[in-house]
A protein has these predicted regions:
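Aromatic- and histidine-enriched alpha-helix N-cap/loop-to-helix transition segments
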Residues: 88, 112-116
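TPR/TPR-like (Sel1-like) alpha-helical repeat modules
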Residues: 126-148
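Residues that mark the junctions of alpha-helical repeat units in TPR/alpha-solenoid scaffolds
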Residues: 73-74, 106, 110-113
C-alpha cells in the first residue's frame, strides 16, 4: 500500500492542507462543522488508500480536539494552539498560529514565530528527520527566549525550552498559563 507523505506526494499534501485549513477555520469560529464538510468532499473524490484512512482518522482526531475545546470552553487562538500541541497536532498548531503571527510585529512576532518553529521541529522529528528538527528547534529556542513575555499563555515555557534543547520525544505537554 502507498504511504501517505505530504512532503513528497502532492495528493497527500493537498488533503493534509485542506483538512488543516478546515480545522483552523472552525477554530476561528468562521464556519461550524467545516472539518466534516471538507472531509466529506475529499472522501467523495478520493477512493484509494491510504488517503481515505487518513481523511477518516483526521476527521476523528479533529473532532476530539473540537469536543475538548468546546466542553472546556477554551477560548482564544493561543489557548487553542496549546490544545493542538497537546493532541500532537503540530502541523495544525503551526497553521493556526500563522493566522495571528501574520498580523503581529516586534517581539510578539518573534515569540509566535518561535512556537511555530517548535511545532515544525516536532513535525520533522516525528517524520524521522532529526537533522532538520534540531536546526528548527535551535531557531525556535532563540526566538522564544528573546520574547518569553509574549508567551505567558504557556505555563511551563521553561520545560518546553529544555525539551527543545534536548529535542525530547515525546514532546512535553504544555500547560495553560
Amino acid at each position: 500500500m502507498k504511504r501517505l507523505d505530504p512532503f513528497s506526494d502532492r495528493m497527500s499534501r493537498d488533503i493534509r492542507n485542506a483538512l488543516s485549513s478546515a480545522l483552523v477555520t472552525e477554530l476561528c469560529g468562521e464556519q461550524d462543522r467545516y472539518v466534516d464538510t471538507v472531509a466529506g468532499r475529499w472522501l467523495d473524490d478520493v477512493g484509494e488508500e491510504p488517503y481515505r484512512s487518513y481523511i477518516e482518522q483526521s476527521r476523528v482526531r479533529y473532532g476530539r480536539v473540537l469536543d475538548h475545546i468546546r466542553k472546556r470552553q477554551i477560548r482564544g487562538t493561543r489557548n487553542h494552539a496549546v490544545v493542538l500541541w497537546n493532541f500532537g497536532l503540530f502541523f495544525e498548531m503551526h497553521e493556526l498560529l500563522e493566522t495571528i503571527w501574520l498580523g503581529s510585529s516586534g517581539k510578539e512576532r518573534d515569540a509566535l514565530k518561535g512556537l511555530i518553529q517548535a511545532a515544525g521541529a516536532y513535525v520533522h522529528l516525528l517524520r524521522g528527520k532529526p537533522v532538520p528538527a534540531r536546526k528548527l528547534a535551535h531557531r525556535a529556542r532563540k526566538n522564544i527566549r528573546k520574547a518569553k513575555e509574549y508567551l505567558s499563555f504557556i505555563g511551563n515555557l521553561d520545560q518546553l525550552l529544555h525539551c527543545l534543547e534536548q529535542l525530547a520525544d515525546p514532546p512535553p505537554k504544555l500547560l495553560h498559563g
